[in-house]
UniProtKB/Swiss-Prot annotation:
Record protein name field: Molybdenum cofactor guanylyltransferase
Encoding gene, per UniProt annotation: mobA
Pfam families noted in UniProt: NTP_transf_3
Species the sequence originates in: Mannheimia succiniciproducens (strain KCTC 0769BP / MBEL55E)
Sequence positions that bind GTP: 10-12, 23, 51, 69, 99
Organism taxonomic ancestry: Bacteria, Pseudomonadati, Pseudomonadota, Gammaproteobacteria, Pasteurellales
InterPro entries: MobA-like_NTP_Trfase (IPR025877), Molybde_CF_guanTrfase (IPR013482), Nucleotide-diphossugar_trans (IPR029044)
NCBIfam families hit by this protein: molyb_mobA
HAMAP family assigned to the protein according to its UniProt record, in alphabetical order: MobA
Summary of subunit composition and partner proteins: Monomer.
Role: Transfers a GMP moiety from GTP to Mo-molybdopterin (Mo-MPT) cofactor (Moco or molybdenum cofactor) to form Mo-molybdopterin guanine dinucleotide (Mo-MGD) cofactor.
Binding positions for Mg(2+) per the UniProt entry: 99
Keywords: Cytoplasm, GTP-binding, Magnesium, Metal-binding, Molybdenum cofactor biosynthesis, Nucleotide-binding, Transferase
Cysteines joined through disulfide linkages: none
């Protein structure tokens, strides 16, 4: 089974734990988080877009397509995922959050292997202790099911994933790669 894949950086949140600032545009190690995440992701895949609900013109400076959630009101990462699946011209979409600059460089390789080997529609990262559902590879065939799920008022990512037979992919040897930047103090950490 050969599948086509594109990628989306999720940067559409409200940044509540950061006082409402746009997380992706906050500086970490001398450059915006989104730039670090983009560069790391670009080492794994060429076709990248950014999901952002604010400051789209700034995100567009990276020279990739930028789109907002179709659903209004900052409804969470599943809203950005839905819009990405609806826009995609590939079989699958790889998602990564904008606030995790050290994610594994083998993320796509391992998630892709899982969906191909198991012939499933969805795989996400697990670090040996915790699930990381925003690091996921999702089939575009799930867009209607996700639209129905969100229309029913649900927002729980893992629940949706489990409903659709998702596989948690082991990244226990890359656990440090899933530490995210949650607050302004984290921006100054090494």
């Amino acid at each position: 089974m050969t599948i086509t894949i594109s990628a989306v950086i999720l940067a559409g949140g409200l940044g509540r734990r950061m006082g409402g600032v746009d997380k992706g545009l906050q500086f970490w190690r001398g450059k915006p988080l989104i730039e670090t995440v983009y560069q790391r992701l670009h080492r794994q895949i060429e076709r990248i877009s950014i999901n952002a609900n604010r400051n789209r013109e700034i995100y567009a400076r990276f020279g990739v397509p930028v789109f907002s959630d179709r659903l209004a009101g900052f409804q969470g990462p599943l809203s950005g995922i839905l819009t990405a699946l609806e826009r995609a011209t590939t079989d699958y979409v790889l998602f990564v959050p904008c606030d995790c600059p050290n994610f594994p460089l083998n993320l796509l390789e391992k998630l892709k292997s899982a969906v191909e080997f198991s012939q499933i529609s969805l795989a996400y990262a697990h670090d040996g202790e915790r699930d990381h559902p925003t690091f996921c590879l999702v089939s575009t065939q799930l867009k209607n099911a996700l639209a129905d799920y969100l229309a029913g008022g649900e927002r729980r990512m893992l629940y949706f994933m489990q409903m659709h037979g998702a596989v948690a992919v082991d990244f226990s040897t890359e656990k440090q790669g899933f530490i995210n930047i949650n607050n302004l103090a984290d921006l100054n950490s090494p």
